[in-house]
Amino acid sequence: MDKKTAVSLLVAASLLAGCAAKPDQAQASSAVDSQINDPFEGFNRTMWKFNYDVLDPYILRPLAVGWSNTPKPITSGIRNVLSNLDEPASAVNYLLQGQPKEAIVHFNRFWINSTFGLLGLVDVAGAAGMQKENQREFGHVLGHYGVGFGPYVMVPGYGSFTPRQDIGGLVDSTYVPLALITPWGSVAKWALEGIDSRADALDKDALLRNSPDSYILFRDAYFQNQNFIVSGGRAPTTENPNAKELNDVIDEID
């Protein structure tokens, strides 16, 4: 389960909580439903069942529990290093969206933390008041310019993805310093980010388990989350009635 999938688990739980308080949720989410392209739903449900019923409880969740019990200075330091590696890609992607202010923040955070923060281990820039902007992936840039998701796919271990977001991820991997990381280093980064995000979702497990259709909830949360990010957190409430909940969840990850 990758970071995006773990984040979607958090968002799904948030949406489930919102649904309990909003009987008209189905009508309010129609705009998101119209964007969902799930031609492989039968296959995806099988993969979801394997990921959720086998890989998560026997592999990912135990790792996440261990991670959550690791001393905070260690997990925070690792999280800072991994996040620092993504700063240049976010800077470029914000520039591509015509948002130079956010791009400059990401660029400055990268060189300051890389130089004075032990290659990002310590968030010196954040301590100086330069708070991190939301990460921007090239897939989000494509969404910003109206490119559709493409078909939704769920695979064992890797989790959920769409062509737009994964093609965007390939583009992001060409930016320095991500382009300098070895294949095994990239796998380690991906795994650590997934475990870290899964640890953040541990207290949401019961909500997802209690859903009448966890696959649909999780899938819809994926699209809600991506749309919320692309909109810069400014999605109209008619399209995203859980905007505050989503923002709170995303803030947990950031």
Predicted features and spans:
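Mid-length scaffold segments of soluble, non-membrane domains
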Residues: 84-163
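A structured, mid-to-C-terminal "fold-capping" secondary-structure block
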Residues: 27-34, 140, 144-254
